[in-house]
């Protein structure tokens, strides 16, 4: 019984579901797809209408990009960029941006 409780606690504290993204691949995708508006590292957007992505939680980034891709989140510009991305690309981008330093402090 004790082992079961410990296993459940480890699963609950074990991090998020998107930890498998590859940050190096995400950087390469970012350079091609995201850099013009958000900056390669996501910390220096081109304008105030573009959010800072650096340091954002990876699960939030996966959800946001997936929602743009599906149309659940309405933004025609982001939909156009998200449409060609595969699930793995989205996870890799999330790993890249979440690993970058940011001056912002994100709360859960």
Segments from the language model and where they lie:
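Positively charged n-region of N-terminal signal peptides that target proteins for export
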Residues: 1-4
